[in-house]
Amino acid sequence: MNTETTNQQTPTQESKPSTRPPLPPFTRETAIQKVRLAEDGWNSRDPEKVALAYTIDSRWRNRAEFPHGRQEIIQFLKRKWAKELDYRLIKELWAYTENRIAVRFAYEWHDDSRNWFRSYGNENWEFNGNGLMALRFASINDLPILESDRKYHWPLGRRPDDHPGLGDLGL
């Protein structure tokens, strides 16, 4: 028996080329769509699903962490959502160019002691021609809040279409 033939690996998500519309060059409308798709993905809190929006060798700076590649991104997100419970996020387009998008965002979460936080931040994204994010730079600050000060009350998952955005909420 030829072991080379029987031990061949099947293609994985790492080796399959993928496209993630909308694709660059972005218009205002497609940049807004891209931001909402990213928000929806992150609100799923599914690290494997979220990681598919990034290139195989995507580079991040998230606070003081520097994940590189999908596998490190998945591990980072698993740690994040194990700590940031009942996570709900709103993103808003700030600026865009041909293949770059800047967003501002705020998300609410609590720790395992039920201490609530609202985290504010900005992200800069750069996309390849297939619409996958190759670079992500995020700056984030956490503000402790009272549970009664929460503004995000939708059921876990995707933010409803009729829910106010950041500007509407005064954030």
Tell where the protein language model's regions lie, with residue ranges.
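Short, well-ordered alpha-helical segments enriched in acidic and aromatic residues
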Residues: 44-57, 61
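Short solvent-exposed beta->alpha transition segments
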Residues: 59-81
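A beta-strand edge to alpha-helix "cap/lid" segment located at domain peripheries
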Residues: 2-26, 75-171
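Short, aromatic-enriched amphipathic alpha-helices that serve as compact interaction elements
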Residues: 27-44
